[in-house]
């Protein structure tokens, strides 16, 4: 009968939705485990096996400084997420630079994110703030006693150093002159009102040979062993000559961020998706009762 058909359809809908809810319950339980794995969980989900080796090599279990997924570690999902906008901010400065016009955006590669993360962890956990040099890549690092935003980070790495670069270039000086000639160094200090004039971070950002980058960020309420609450880093490489990356898995920041957000949002929304579907199941059960 029509009535029986309606009952059967309602029963089928309930059965199907019950399966969905059971799966979502499992997803929710696994989400907490995956969140705790930080960037490792993300790299595993997308099959970035070379990248996982970097985390493994530098993990605390192997005597390194990377405590995978910990809140005050660059591999935590929140710190990873925070670091992504640094790529875009740096690219905007790079591609509009007046000294080297026509530069293209740096692409990204998961392995360079991992290298940036483990190197920044080594920096933050060192006795003093400095480059860890664990891998052969270019690197900019910065530290602050507050939660630094991209503008402030790149103000130090780019804006202030471009002033120095422009000043010495206008006088026909090189960066070696700046380093080795005390009188010239002092002149730049006074002219630009900069305590430590330098150009190395700026020249990394505008280096035409670099093709690919990865970034990392740490903020912890208590200062890290290097004395700073905030540590940030960006590494640079060229996949033609790199020991770590190839064109495979090298992509735009937009493509990478889409992957990251899909993974992150699924984990973070596991709770609400479960409760939405539980509500849907309850209303389907109520419909079934009405049909009987």
Region spans (language model):
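Long, non-membrane, amphipathic alpha-helices that form coiled-coils
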Residues: 1-38, 253-292
């Amino acid at each position: 009968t029509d009535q029986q058909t309606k009952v059967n359809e309602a029963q089928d809908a309930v059965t199907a939705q019950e399966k969905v809810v059971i799966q979502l319950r499992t997803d929710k339980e696994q989400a907490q485990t995956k969140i705790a794995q930080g960037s490792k969980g993300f790299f595993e989900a997308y099959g970035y096996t070379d990248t996982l080796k970097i985390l493994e090599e530098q993990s605390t279990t192997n005597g390194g400084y990377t405590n995978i997924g910990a809140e005050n570690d660059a591999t935590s999902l929140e710190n990873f997420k925070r670091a992504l906008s640094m790529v875009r901010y740096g690219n905007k400065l790079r591609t509009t630079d007046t000294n080297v016009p026509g530069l293209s955006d740096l692409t990204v590669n998961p392995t360079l994110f991992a290298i940036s993360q483990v190197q920044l962890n080594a920096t933050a956990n060192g006795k003093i703030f400095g480059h860890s040099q664990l891998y052969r890549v270019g690197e900019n690092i910065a530290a602050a006693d507050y939660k630094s935003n991209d503008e402030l980070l790149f103000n130090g790495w780019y804006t202030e150093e471009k002033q120095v670069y422009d000043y010495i270039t206008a006088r026909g000086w090189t960066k070696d002159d700046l380093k080795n000639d005390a009188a010239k160094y002092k002149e730049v200090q006074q002219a630009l009102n900069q305590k430590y004039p330098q150009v190395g971070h700026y020249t990394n950002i505008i280096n035409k040979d670099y093709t690919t980058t990865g970034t990392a960020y740490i903020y912890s309420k208590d200062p890290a062993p290097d004395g700073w609450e905030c540590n940030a880093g960006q590494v640079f490489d060229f996949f033609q000559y790199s020991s770590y990356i190839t064109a495979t898995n090298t992509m735009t920041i937009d493509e990478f961020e889409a992957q990251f957000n899909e993974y992150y949002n699924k984990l973070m929304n596991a709770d609400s998706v479960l409760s939405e579907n539980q509500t849907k199941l309850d209303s389907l059960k109520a419909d079934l009762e009405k049909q009987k």
